[in-house]
């Protein structure tokens, strides 16, 4: 049985890499609507879109979503979730799932999975998902975040760089994946308890988070354990660039 949880979808208009991304149309709908529709197919008790832009609020209201206008000075999507959890009055032990607003093809099953994993691992403050990397180009792509875990499935670290660096194998050949190294791609979906979100904001960003532009590093920096499991279904990949948008359009529009 899936644990009770609320989905929050952070959606920023002013992305430095791809401004206006949540409202880009795919199959005749704004991308954020597709994300919301996938989240609504999960077992979530509630699905809320959180944004700092009135244009996104208007678009979300037009397709019937619950949407909250948040401050525009948050350092990360998780900071925005903390404000939403406070606005919603969620109990400290309530589970909140962060579904990125640029994942229009996120499988509902993985939304349920990440919530259930957090409920099953009280030693972890967060849970997230990953999948194997089987392409050397993905290993060197900074838009694909790599994760390494310990024997208990808890994250050691995340990086945009190849992780781990197979010194001898990559010195000899960078055109193929080193044999025997279980490289994994991080999937940008998280579950937290609402009380943790308050702590996350109180810590503020750390230098490692700022350097990599990876908010989950703030949790590791402060000693929080992050449970990582391989996804039950592999998402086809999110939309980070205009090229990604065209790829997703081809998949969904035929």
Curated annotation (Swiss-Prot):
Highest taxon in the source lineage: Bacteria
EC number(s) on file: 2.7.7.38
Catalytic activities: 3-deoxy-alpha-D-manno-oct-2-ulosonate + CTP = CMP-3-deoxy-beta-D-manno-octulosonate + diphosphate
GO cellular component terms, semicolon-separated: cytosol
GO molecular function: 3-deoxy-manno-octulosonate cytidylyltransferase activity
Functional pathway: Nucleotide-sugar biosynthesis; CMP-3-deoxy-D-manno-octulosonate biosynthesis; CMP-3-deoxy-D-manno-octulosonate from 3-deoxy-D-manno-octulosonate and CTP: step 1/1; Bacterial outer membrane biogenesis; lipopolysaccharide biosynthesis
EC supergroup of this enzyme: transferase
A Pfam match: CTP_transf_3
Gene3D superfamilies named in the record: Spore Coat Polysaccharide Biosynthesis Protein SpsA, Chain A (3.90.550.10)
One of the GO biological process terms: CMP-keto-3-deoxy-D-manno-octulosonic acid biosynthetic process
Location within or outside the cell: Cytoplasm
Alphabetically ordered keywords of this record: Cytoplasm, Lipopolysaccharide biosynthesis, Nucleotidyltransferase, Transferase
InterPro entries the UniProt entry points to: Cytidylyl_trans (IPR003329), KdsB (IPR004528), Nucleotide-diphossugar_trans (IPR029044)
Family statement drawn from the similarity comment of this UniProt entry: Belongs to the KdsB family.
PANTHER family: 3-DEOXY-MANNO-OCTULOSONATE CYTIDYLYLTRANSFERASE (PTHR42866), 3-DEOXY-MANNO-OCTULOSONATE CYTIDYLYLTRANSFERASE, MITOCHONDRIAL (PTHR42866:SF2)
Task performed by this protein: Activates KDO (a required 8-carbon sugar) for incorporation into bacterial lipopolysaccharide in Gram-negative bacteria.
Stored HAMAP family: KdsB (MF_00057)
Name of the featured protein: 3-deoxy-manno-octulosonate cytidylyltransferase
């Amino acid at each position: 049985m899936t644990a009770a949880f609320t989905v929050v979808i952070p959606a920023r208009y002013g992305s430095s890499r791809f401004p206006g991304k949540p409202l880009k149309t795919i199959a005749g709908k704004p991308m954020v609507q597709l994300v919301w529709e996938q989240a609504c197919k999960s077992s979530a008790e509630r699905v809320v879109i959180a944004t700092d832009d009135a244009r996104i609020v208007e678009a979300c209201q037009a397709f019937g979503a619950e949407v909250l206008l948040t401050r525009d000075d948050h350092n990360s999507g998780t900071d925005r979730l903390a404000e939403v959890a406070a606005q919603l009055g969620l109990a400290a032990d309530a589970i909140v799932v962060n579904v990125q607003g640029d994942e229009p093809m996120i499988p509902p099953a993985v939304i349920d999975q990440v919530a259930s994993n957090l409920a099953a691992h009280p030693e972890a403050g967060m849970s997230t998902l990953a999948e194997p990397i089987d392409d050397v180009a993905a290993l060197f792509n900074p838009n694909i975040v790599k994760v390494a875990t310990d024997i208990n499935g808890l994250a050691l670290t995340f990086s945009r760089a190849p992780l781990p660096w197979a010194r001898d194998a990559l010195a000899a050949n960078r055109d193929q994946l080193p044999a025997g190294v279980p490289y994994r791609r991080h999937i940008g979906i998280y579950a937290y308890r609402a009380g943790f979100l308050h702590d996350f904001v109180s810590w503020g960003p750390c230098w490692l988070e700022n350097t990599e532009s990876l908010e989950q590093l703030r949790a590791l920096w402060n000693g929080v354990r992050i449970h990582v499991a391989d996804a039950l279904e592999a998402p086809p990949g999110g939309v980070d660039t205009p090229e990604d948008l065209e790829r997703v359009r081809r998949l969904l529009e035929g």
